Structure formats: C-alpha cells, structure tokens
Amino acid sequence: MPQSVPLFQIEPVSKAQDQLIQQKIDLKTKPPGALGQLESLALQIARIQGAKQLQIVYPTMLVFAGDHGIAAEGVSIAPSEVTRQMVQNFAHGGAAINVFCRQLGFNLEVIDCGILTPVEDAEGIIDQRLGAGTAAIHLEPAMTLACVDKGFAMAQALIERHHQAGCNLVAFGEMGIGNTSSAAAIMAAIMQLDVADCVGRGTGINSETLERKQMLIELALLLHQSAMTGPRQVLACLGGFEIVQMTGAMLAAAERKMLVVVDGFIATAAALVAVSINANVRDYLIFAHRSEEQGHQRMLEHLKAKPLLSLGLRLGEGTGAALALPLIQAAVNFYNQMASFSDAGIEAVV
C-alpha cells in the first residue's frame, strides 16, 4: 500500500481582535504607522498567538540538505560533492549560518534529506534521507509521489518534536547544489510562467550555463506537463528532497500555529507549494528577505509578501531568515513593552 499523504489541518488566523490589536499598536508613544513594517509584523504575530503578550520561544533554524540529479548537467558553478562538504562544514560550525545562529540565539539543526553520500559520524546532522539525490528532472520524475508523502510525514514528525520542546518560531534554510534549477522549475509550473522569468544565475553561473539551465528546465516542464495535476505531483516531478521536506515542515508548523520564517528563493518555492496545498499556511509565513535570484521578486509578489530585508543575499542556508530574527523580536518587544500615551502621560498624536 502506498503511504498516505499527511493531512494538515491548518486554521486561518482569526481577525476578530484586529481592531483591539491595532488600537494597542496605534496608542503606543509614536505617530500611527511610525514603526512601519514592524507594526504590520506585530499585527500578524498577535493574530497568530492570540495573546496580550507576544513571545518568541526557542527559535529554531532548520537547514534541509539534498542533492539534485540535474546538477550532473553542469547547471551550477559547483559540483554535487560540495553539498556534502557544506553539510560537513555545518556540522563543524564553520558556515555562515552557524555564525549567525550563534550570534542571534537560534537553535540550529541540519537535516540530511538525501545528499549523494551521507556524512559519517557528524554530530547534529539529522538523518531523514529519502534517497541518494533526486533523479534528473529533464529525463524522469525527481521522485515518486510516495516519496513526497514520506518526506511530508518525516517533516511533520520533525516539527512535532520541536513543538513539543516549546519552540514557537521555526526558520527554514537549505543546501543543495542544483536546487535553484528545481525551485525555478516549480515556480514556472505553479505560477504558469515562462522559464526565462524564473531562472537566475544561482551561485553565479555565466551566460552559457544559464542558457543550458533554462533549456533543461524547459525540457523538464514539457516532459512532465501531463503528470503535474497538483502541487504534490509538481514536487514529485520537479522537486528536491530538501524542498519536499521544507514544504511539509512549513505546513506542519502552520498547523501548530508556529511562526514560519522563510529564507530566500528555494525556501520561497517550498512556501509556494505549501500555499498551493493549503492556502491558510500563508497567514503564518514571515518572509525574511528579497534575494538576488531574479525570480524571487515574482514569487514574493505572487504570495503578496513584503520581505523584511533586502541585502543582496544569494547564499541560502537560511542566512537571511537568521538575520531577520532581531526584527521579529523587535516587533514583539515594542508591542509588549512600549508605553502607551496614557501610560506615559503624553498627549496622543493624531
């Protein structure tokens, strides 16, 4: 029997208290709207948490790693072996995401979703392997639909473990040579766009490689057109093991009313699939930054997302999501701690 797909029961956030929440924000000692995007962020968090005092508890960064069959076609400046080497680097604490998580107070967990060769005896690497890299999407489906469902179930268990530990904010990063190709293909399929509008230079490929990358994605979309009857099928045809598990984890986190912080292009592609599966997940998504990958802005617009940062990042790993945490904490803190006009004995600014 094939594994059944996990059912995600995601409630939309309630807007019943919006007037009271907005009034609390507006009566802080500042002109209305003066804290800009932090105010809309505080409103979003207050809707999710439904509490008088907002909080961030045990913020956790999950970095999902997987390899891609299409990488063998030279669509990236780096070979697939670099995925494993970077996972080792994560385990040794030497990557940018390690540095930022230490600085900012994130609990970091790295999940091997299916790199070509597992890292042996690596402390802190969680084994959730779905295979040794996906198939090449321009030649065959990346994986089976049963594999997608297994990845969702694994992701659901992962999120439940962190939720049981008290975590209420989870951020998403990734590592996988070739995964911008998979993400661009997913974007083109779901948003019904030309591949040229979705494909970017990833880690910095030249124009010749960019043309080859675009051609291979076009072949993949043509090959799987009839099979892509829904978002799970899109993942099976075009996805990466890490994108599958990110998608499932976002759905599971929203189901548990956790804050979901989305990193860059790859993580946003996972969010795009998650929203296609259950539109209510969108209420729980906080988009950390606008990356340099050219398709990212289009996806953000499609998801009606206004990212917190725009720093020219194109690294992945969850680095942008990590850097957004102080802003999220600032939104929580001003909401909880900032005096109202009446508290401070100041005449209200109209």
UniProtKB/Swiss-Prot annotation:
- An example of a Gene Ontology BP annotation on this entry? cobalamin biosynthetic process
Write down the InterPro entries for this protein, in alphabetical order.
Nict_dMeBzImd_PRibTrfase, Nict_dMeBzImd_PRibTrfase_bact, Nict_dMeBzImd_PRibTrfase_N, Nict_dMeBzImd_PRibTrfase_sf
Q: Does the keyword Ribosomal protein apply?
A: no
Gene Ontology MF term list? nicotinate-nucleotide-dimethylbenzimidazole phosphoribosyltransferase activity
State the similarity comment. Answer: Belongs to the CobT family.
Q: Which PANTHER family match?
A: NICOTINATE-NUCLEOTIDE--DIMETHYLBENZIMIDAZOLE PHOSPHORIBOSYLTRANSFERASE (PTHR43463:SF1)
Q: What is this protein called?
A: Nicotinate-nucleotide--dimethylbenzimidazole phosphoribosyltransferase
The organism's taxonomic lineage, starting at the top = Bacteria, Pseudomonadati, Pseudomonadota, Gammaproteobacteria, Alteromonadales
